[in-house]
Amino acid sequence: MATQKARNMAIKENDMRAPLKEYEAVQEAAMKFVKSVAEGNSKYARELFIDEAVLFGYLDNKLEHGSIEQFYHNVDTVPGGDHFKARVDVIALEETLAVVRVLEEGWGNRIDFTDYLLLLKMNDEWKCVAKAYNQNSNTIQR
C-alpha cells in the first residue's frame, strides 16, 4: 500500500502541466484564426499556420483535404458575416503541443463549424500544423 502511494506521488510530481500563461498564449494564437474568419481575410491565419499545414473536413458534404491554402481561399472569398460568433477552448496543452477547439456560428451567415487545431510550439511561438473540422449537419447546403 505504501509503495503504491509513493508511486502515485512520484507520478504527480512529474506531471508536466503547462503554466497558465501558456494557455493564454495558445488562446491568443488561436484568435488569429478567429479574426481571419470573422473579417474574411486570411492575413491573420497566415501568421498562425505553417506553410506545410494541412486541413481535413467536409464543407457542404464535399471533402476538403490537403494544403491549408484551401482554407485561405474559403476565408478570403466568404466574409464571416454579421452574425458570426466564435469560442476558443484550449482542450489539451503540454510543453510543445496544444489542441484547440473553435466553435463557430454563422460563418457566411449560414454555416456552423467545430474546428480542431493542432498547434506546436516552434521557436518559442505557437504555430498551427493541422486543422480538422466538422460542419454542423443542419447547416449543410444540399
Q: What residue ranges belong to the model's regions?
A:
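Generic alpha-helical hydrophobic packing signal
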Residues: Y23-V26, K32-F33, T96-A98, L118, ...
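Surface-exposed, charged secondary-structure patches
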Residues: K21-A25, V54-D60, H65-D112
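Short, hydrophobic secondary-structure boundary micro-motifs
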Residues: R46-E47, F56-Y58, V129
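Residue-level detector of alpha-helical recognition elements and their boundaries
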Residues: N41, L48, L59-N61, D115, ...
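Short beta-strand segments enriched in hydrophobic/aromatic residues
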Residues: F49, E104-G106, A132-Y133
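Short, low-complexity N-terminal intrinsically disordered segments enriched in polar/charged residues
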Residues: A2-K43, E47-D51, T139-Q141
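Short beta-strand edge/turn micro-motifs at domain boundaries
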Residues: D112-R142
